[in-house]
């Protein structure tokens, strides 16, 4: 059938593609090898970042055809820690990020997208992979290898709502720690880019840090882990296969925020089918510049170490962190000069 499209993977990217296709008269079938959506997630909080583009992420979701039928809380402020300096307060005029829940809970991002897809007549086949690729297929199966990993806990708490970020290589080498609390539930995690074999040590250091620096009431803790994959290749359209989300390497290499790229790439893949457009042209225009800028940002933050962490913390605190980040996520002449060096240090081009 001409209007029959198969989608491999029921994550945010795959479900977004399914929703957009269904709204335009197509009949997408989503195949998910897990028994339900969000199975790889753990009920943890994540952030829909709101700084890498001018358009507010919630406005973008609505523009793409996604309803906000899930927990989505704007956070405008928080605390930031960096080595050898006192913690600083940051505050923004626009939301720095929107807190969302991942996993299968009724108010999760994943479950919300599932409800929207099903309401439009999308068929989701769980616990099954696609067996044939004779029809046009969108591949949204998530990351394949770990370029960074996350180790953390979810927990119940009486601590008031907050957002905390820590830059410290003793806790999260070349990465960061985040603490998010909303209405009695919290997520605390260390995102690590180096020395994966010592993850347990860094997680222990994380718990010790919060015991010493910022008391957090933690009850009913549940541990979780995850990983992210980043690469940039020349094409993400192979014969009848279109790759989106982390299957295409679409991930912010600086800090691992991939949800914006997931939904945007799902939308672009759907529109390439609906309007018979070149998918590679679309993602290279809308996504690739941000990917390359994030690669340069990753190179710079690793190069400058503790000095870089303190510089970022001070910049976030002395002005509007969203505006500062937005400027630094945009391509520039200087970053175009640094890009070849960043490429040579990170062998992430051309991976399949």
Residue ranges and their predicted role:
Residues 8-10, 22-44:
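Glycine-rich FAD pyrophosphate-binding loop
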């Amino acid at each position: 059938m001409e209007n029959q499209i198969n989608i491999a993977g029921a994550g945010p990217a795959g479900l977004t593609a399914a929703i957009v296709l269904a709204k335009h008269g197509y009949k997408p079938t989503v195949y998910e090898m897990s028994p339900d959506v969000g199975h790889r997630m753990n009920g943890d909080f994540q952030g829909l970042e709101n700084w890498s583009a001018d358009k507010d992420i919630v406005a973008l979701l609505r523009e793409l055809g996604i309803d906000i039928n899930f927990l989505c809380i704007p956070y405008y402020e928080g605390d930031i820690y960096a080595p050898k300096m006192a913690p600083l307060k940051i505050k923004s005029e626009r939301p720095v990020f929107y807190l969302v829940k991942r996993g299968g809970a009724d108010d999760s991002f994943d479950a919300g997208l599932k409800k929207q897809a099903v309401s439009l007549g999308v068929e989701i086949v769980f616990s099954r992979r696609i067996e044939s690729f004779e029809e046009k297929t969108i591949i949204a199966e998530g990351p394949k290898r770990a370029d960074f990993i996350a180790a953390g806990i979810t927990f119940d708490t009486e601590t008031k709502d907050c957002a905390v970020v820590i830059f410290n290589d003793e806790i999260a080498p070349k990465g960061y720690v985040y603490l998010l609390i909303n209405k009695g539930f919290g997520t605390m995690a260390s995102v690590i880019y180096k020395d994966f074999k010592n993850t347990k040590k860094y997680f222990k250091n994380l718990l010790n840090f919060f015991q010493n620096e910022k008391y957090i009431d933690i009850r009913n803790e549940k541990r979780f882990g995850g990983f992210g994959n980043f690469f940039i290749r020349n094409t993400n359209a192979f014969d009848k296969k279109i790759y989106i989300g982390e299957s295409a390497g679409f991930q912010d290499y600086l800090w691992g925020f991939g949800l914006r790229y997931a939904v945007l790439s799902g939308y672009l893949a759907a529109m390439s089918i609906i309007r018979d457009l070149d998918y590679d042209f679309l993602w290279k225009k809308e996504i690739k510049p941000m990917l390359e800028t994030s690669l340069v940002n990753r190179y710079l933050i690793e190069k400058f170490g503790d000095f870089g962490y303190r510089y970022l913390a001070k910049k976030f605190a002395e002005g509007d962190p969203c505006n500062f980040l937005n400027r630094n996520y945009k391509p520039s002449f200087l970053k175009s000069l640094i890009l070849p060096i960043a490429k040579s240090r990170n062998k992430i081009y051309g991976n399949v």
